[in-house]
């Protein structure tokens, strides 16, 4: 057997080996992306400032309309708490809805509190959508996923 006869076999083996390495690297990239995304989410979710804001919404927010909420909280801590918490859940909703993260992984942990927050703010959001139709839409679309897990 001549050396030239082995060339196609060597090339095919090298190509196959390269393809396997690329697949392994892509899996690692996916895993790294997952870790980076979820670590950031949990870091925010577990922070004292976020928890304080979330607890304020769930336990102290009493307004039932967007105009009433704005009248009492615009430019104050209440508005900041509302924007912080709802913005967070809306962004998580975007990740879940675009399937950039697997819902069970996140929602088994944060889903219960997301439901509590959504239940509390839903009347305000409905009212606010008269002016801003897409307001917190990804958060709302995530809520049924939260109930699944």
Predicted regions and their residues:
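Hydrophobic/aromatic-lined pockets within catalytic cores
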Residues: 21, 25, 42, 46, ...
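Membrane-interfacial loop-to-transmembrane-helix junctions in polytopic alpha-helical membrane proteins
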Residues: 3-6, 75, 79
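Membrane-interacting alpha-helical segments
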Residues: 50, 54-75, 123-135
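An amphipathic alpha-helical interaction surface
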Residues: 81-149
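Surface-exposed, interaction-prone regions with an acidic/low-complexity signature
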Residues: 44, 73, 80
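Amphipathic, membrane-active segments
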Residues: 28-66
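Membrane-embedded hydrophobic alpha-helical segments
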Residues: 1-36
